[in-house]
């Protein structure tokens, strides 16, 4: 005669990570590190695809510096409001600075940052990146 399956037992006590653990002691535990924590990423991207890709790096813990062109105060390269939800979503977890890559001073600051960076992301047209001197070959010489 077949036996009837037994019902699973309900635990009588709630499970805890450690005996005697309290909310106060849990607050002292170190936070888990994010996978890209400690990486420096320079973000020269504009429009949708580039900022979305770099946002993922920032979400995973990379220190992302978004480099913006002068004259974009209040708006991004597409004309969207910097204070709107779309801009805020695309550029969350990023720091930002303004650099004029067409000026010798701005380019010098960028090159100093690029020498220390782990990653430089850009999505300029080929002629633009070469004219600005931020193409792969130019930046790779520094780092």
Kindly give the residue locations of the regions a language model identified.
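N-terminal helix-loop segment corresponding to the beta1-alpha1 unit
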Residues: 2-143
């Amino acid at each position: 005669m077949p036996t009837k399956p037994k019902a699973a037992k309900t635990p009588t006590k709630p499970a805890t990570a450690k005996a005697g653990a309290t909310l106060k002691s849990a607050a002292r535990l170190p936070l888990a590190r994010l996978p890209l924590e400690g990486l420096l990423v320079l973000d020269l991207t504009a429009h949708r695809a580039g900022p979305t890709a770099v946002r993922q790096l920032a979400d995973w813990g990379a220190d992302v510096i978004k480099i913006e062109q002068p004259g974009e105060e209040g708006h991004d390269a597409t004309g969207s409001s910097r204070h709107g939800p779309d801009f805020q979503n695309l550029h969350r977890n990023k720091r930002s600075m303004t650099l004029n890559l067409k000026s010798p001073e701005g380019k010098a600051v960028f090159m100093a940052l690029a020498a220390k960076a782990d990653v430089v992301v850009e999505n300029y047209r080929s002629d633009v990146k070469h004219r600005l001197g931020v193409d792969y070959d130019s930046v790779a010489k520094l780092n």
